[in-house]
């Protein structure tokens, strides 16, 4: 009996002495990496589509809690940026989602603007708002400033309720000498002032995501997006930096305090929310909106929520993401719930991360969804026939 006990104890001691590796050899569980691991790391990036194993709560939001004004769309626009949807079907879709109004930003001017007004604005009162734009083909005309003021007046008389400026200002529009037109170019001053006189807002897209100004390489967090759209890259000496562009923009904001500006895409730099907050503090004539920046904001939910809570009177709901119902429902989930680690709505892929819900309180939701936009458009002083 004493001999058997000794054998058992000796066996146990040997097992413990051998450590986890020794026991693993018997069970098939390993504690050392495979010697051929490096040779297996050859999966193509496009084929790497991991499915999260996280078991997180899911709260689907099929319909917004409060009526919504989407201030950033291009649906049935004059430029051809947005989705083409039959207006009657679009209204039915909006009703299902609790969307009160959508703003079509790229309406151009003249006959093209009139077509949108005749086909969408007039037949469906209150459901569609359309903006006008600059005609850059006239930039070299010595009377450019006066021509744009007259064009804005004509557009407003037709029914336009704002001016939209695409990112081409500062990045693409050039004069006859090849020189880029700066955002704070003095030739634009009369147009900004005219918008203030009429009480219509200027929605301006300045720069683009910060990653678009970085090299397209393995360190760029939006590599896949830029490979798909290399024309979205603004890296190189032929382009001004993001910092230079927002500096031009800020000089323009300061020069025209009586004009209301909306700094699209959450103030032009959502990767830097301290900068966005400084913009709002510095310029009382500036508002922001959420268009196409759910991904950027959703990955930094605590700081983003602070901005929403502190500046709840200055933020509007915008998408800039087509007209799909699932897209809208994803935005609603992001704003209304506290769900964790779920996909953002935008396509193409912006970056390999997930987002987190903000869980905004009702009073803030109402302002963001419709209250702030209603207050902005209520500043209209007349000048149109509609």
Language model features by range: what are they?
Residues 7-19:
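Bacterial N-terminal signal peptides
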Residues 76-85, 105-114, 137-146, 173, ...:
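Acidic-and-aromatic substrate-binding clefts and catalytic sites of carbohydrate-active enzymes
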């Amino acid at each position: 009996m004493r001999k058997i006990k000794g054998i058992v104890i000796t066996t146990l001691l040997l097992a413990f002495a051998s450590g986890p590796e020794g026991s693993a050899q018997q069970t098939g569980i390993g504690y050392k990496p495979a010697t051929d691991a490096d040779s297996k790391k050859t999966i193509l990036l496009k084929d790497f589509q991991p499915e999260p194993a996280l078991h997180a709560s899911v709260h689907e939001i099929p319909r917004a809690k409060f009526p919504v004004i989407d201030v950033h769309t291009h649906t049935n626009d004059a430029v051809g940026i947005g989705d083409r949807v039959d207006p009657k079907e679009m209204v039915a879709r909006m009703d299902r989602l609790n969307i009160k109004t959508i703003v079509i930003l790229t309406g151009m001017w003249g006959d093209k603007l009139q077509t949108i007004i005749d086909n969408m604005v007039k037949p469906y009162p209150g459901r569609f708002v359309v903006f006008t734009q600059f005609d850059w083909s006239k930039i070299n005309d010595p009377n450019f400033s006066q021509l744009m003021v007259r064009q804005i007046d004509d557009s407003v008389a037709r029914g336009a309720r704002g001016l939209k400026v695409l990112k081409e200002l500062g990045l693409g529009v050039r004069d006859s000498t090849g020189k880029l037109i700066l955002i704070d170019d003095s030739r634009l001053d009369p147009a900004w002032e005219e918008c203030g006189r009429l009480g219509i807002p200027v929605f301006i897209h300045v720069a683009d995501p910060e990653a678009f100004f970085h090299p397209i390489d393995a360190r760029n967090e939006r590599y896949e997006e830029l490979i798909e759209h290399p024309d979205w890259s603004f890296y190189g000496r032929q382009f001004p930096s993001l910092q230079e562009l927002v500096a031009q923009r800020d000089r323009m904001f300061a020069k025209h305090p009586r004009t209301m500006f909306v700094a699209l895409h959450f103030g032009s730099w959502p990767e830097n929310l301290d900068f966005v907050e400084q913009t709002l503090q510095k310029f009382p004539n500036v508002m922001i909106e959420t268009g196409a920046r759910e991904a950027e904001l959703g990955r930094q939910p605590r700081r983003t929520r602070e901005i929403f809570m502190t500046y709840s009177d200055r933020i509007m709901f915008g998408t800039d993401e087509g007209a799909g119902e699932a897209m809208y429902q994803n935005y609603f989930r992001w704003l209304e719930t506290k769900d964790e680690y779920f996909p953002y709505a935008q396509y193409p892929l912006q970056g390999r991360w997930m987002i987190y819900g903000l869980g905004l309180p009702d009073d803030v939701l109402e302002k963001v969804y419709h209250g702030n936009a209603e207050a902005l458009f209520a500043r209209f002083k007349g000048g149109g026939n509609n």
